[in-house]
Amino acid sequence: MKPFARSLRAWLAASLALATMLSPLAAQELRWQLPKNGGALYKRTLQVEEDVEPKQTWVPGVWHGEPMVAAVLADELAPDRQRMLEPASDPRDLLACIALDLRQPRGGKTRLEVETFARFFPLQVDVVLGELAADGSQSISATIEVDAKAARVASTNPNIAKLRGKLQGRRVFDAGKGVVTSIEGSAEFTVDYPAFTEGTEVRPVRKQQIRVRDTWQLDAVLGPDDAEFRTRVAKAIHDSVAALQKELTTRLDGKFDDGGGDPHHEHRPGELALVLLALKRAGEDTRDPLLQKGYATLRRLVIAGSYELGVAILAMEALYTPPTEWEEMRTGRQKAPTPRTPSAEDLAILREWTKKLLGNIDTTVDAAYLRRWHYGPSTGWDNSCTQYALLGLYAASLCGVEISPTVWTASINHWLKCTKPGASGAPRLTYQHDLAKGNRTRAGGAKVLAVGWAYQDGEATGSMTTAGISALTLCTSALRIQKKGNPKLLADADAAVRGGFLWLEQNFSVRHNPGPRGEWPNWQLYYLYGLERACELNQVALLGDRDWYFEGAVRLLVSQRADGNWGDWVATAFGLLFLKKTALPAMTGR
């Protein structure tokens, strides 16, 4: 038996050597090799063609929100560094999600269960991968069908469509770099919409054919401390400033009016103010003729809504912000904001806007105890209007407009009253002044409840949780500057801020607005600007292990259009404000 055993071992060794020689990569476990807190950035070309049969005047949109951000972030990877933990949420992105998963270098069959947005049934994706070739290439094919069990459960829901399709493609993996260097392929989908009645309108069965062509090409592998990352951010800022200047020039050359100052429906003054704020925070000279024309226009407009008034006050305060204040407070050399000294004309305007803003509250509650805002004077409220009202009031207070301490205490009561509590824990936060000294120690502290906030009722979202953190931070800062405030109320507010950061740590993403799946594609850049503001107000550099600024910046770098925009001028202003990291200064309790 010994000669036979030796022969068998020799045969197995030779077979293994041959297999390795033919495809050495296929015998390895593939893993992503990315810098700490870093990521791989890609250039993505996505083409989508849609046909509707029979032709209808109304067909629901198939794709909900922006496609997948063309990047792989180190802190989004599973512990095995073979796949991303972010689930696929859009059929456009199925090819990329399969190609970025490195768990099957030897090829074979596997099944992915994809939870898409509520418009579709959950999908079953049956994948066939070819063996990884010596050059790193690997073929991909898949069939996509509705999960039959889920379809039976949800078959009476008229808002859910059925999707099926096929895709073909290939990826190339560079073992030396530890990254996927390219993805290319195509897919064809058929979407069936059931017939249903909405009001008096009967909507018949609808069918849609979709063809997708998707290409990814590796652009760069970057880390937060790389000079190349800083260079790219600087270029993105430059390009977005140029885009906003171009759009602002066009709009101011026409007849820019306030639409009568309707607080519920007229948002043009607020959009103008947001763009002026972004340009001023980006470092544009106050003496610039375009900026002067924009501010002159803003000063003459009739402004009534809470959003518009809040942002207009922020834009005005930006004219008088000391140029070195942000860096002084960021490094800890300065503890409290410097009082602003606006001109007499601007101070009068700020007082007028502040008076209007203080009147846009919910009239159904005692404003001395509970203060919350809506678009105008109203019997309702929402946390988005409330956040922007408080941003404006805090900026006005920095400019010398007197705000009663009752406004801040009653606002704190509101935010504490409408939290959405979760599990307890200690948020792991690294502060900017510690990181600047090379200290990456996470400050844990006492356990708190993770708390999020919603727009009104419902589940917590990332955009509204950052709003709650920012609002409470500004209210407590104002009370500390005034040397007012009940110590217990301040402590409760500080604990809620820490709870908000714990919620963000537990739900963190820059790919979508965290919270219920249906909210993911909504208000993404609004959320990013809110994330920047919440973290900068509290001088937070790292949320747990996540570098929120690097990840958010990468999301913006790979999605910025060739003309410098991220959509309309409001979206571009939000993107620019995130990249510049110039939130209002706050006096915290630390």
Task: Please place each PLM-identified region on the residue numbering.
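Signature of exported/secreted
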Residues: 27-224, 391
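Preference for long, amphipathic alpha-helical scaffolds in soluble/luminal domains
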Residues: 213-590
